[in-house]
A protein has these predicted regions:
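S-adenosylmethionine
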Residues: 1-198
Length: 198
């Protein structure tokens, strides 16, 4: 198994599917920048961001769950990255977030979602989601995206992603955000990825 391969144990690679990698490449973090992974979870995308930053700059890995951040610790140790700073937050208005207002170059929001884009791997999800639960999630997603936008300096970048296929959790969230924040503009993912040869 890959998890027992010497190169994996040395931190030379992580296992991650394409859909999980793309948000990191869309964020395009650079060496020496200040970057926030707003909903870091167990840190798969965090590790990619840290590697793309060439282990320089400062990368904050925020999450509301101690358990998920605890799962990041061994992965972070294995990776050898020293630019990652995991921190538990209470919510998107936490003082740890507010103190970074206007100082951050790039923010990744991999928002909590219904997960309905992962039905192939998690077929039981379709029975656990309802219109009400999705509506509740969209309120949370919009609040997180608004909070993330306050962090970026002028000219910075925010990438919003979910693993849902629902318009309500994606296009509608982004459209409402752009209507509320005319100082932000939509950049086609294809243009960013093409520039990187992806």
């Amino acid at each position: 198994a890959l998890a027992k391969h010497p190169l994996f144990l040395e931190g030379a690679f992580e296992v991650q599917d394409e859909g999980s990698q793309l948000p990191g490449y869309l964020l395009e973090p650079k060496r020496g920048e200040m970057v926030v992974d707003f909903c870091a979870g167990a840190g798969g995308k965090t590790l990619l961001l840290g590697a793309l930053m060439k282990n320089t700059g400062r990368l904050y890995a925020f999450d509301v769950s101690d358990k998920r951040l605890a799962n990041l610790k061994p992965r972070l140790a294995r990776s050898g990255l020293s630019n990652v700073h995991p921190a538990r937050i209470e919510h998107e208005r936490d003082t740890k977030i507010k103190r970074l207002a206007g100082k951050v170059d790039r923010v990744l929001v991999d928002a909590p979602c219904s997960g309905l884009g992962t039905l192939r791997r998690n077929p039981d999800l379709k029975w656990r989601q309802s219109e009400d639960s999705v509506a509740e999630l969209t309120v949370k997603q919009a609040a997180i995206l608004d909070a993330a936008a306050k962090l970026v300096r002028p000219g910075g970048r925010v990438v919003y992603a979910t693993c849902s296929l629902l318009t309500a959790e994606n296009d509608a969230i982004v459209a409402a955000f752009l209507a509320k924040h005319p100082d932000f503009s939509l950049v086609p993912a294809s243009a960013i990825l093409a520039k990187q040869g992806i």
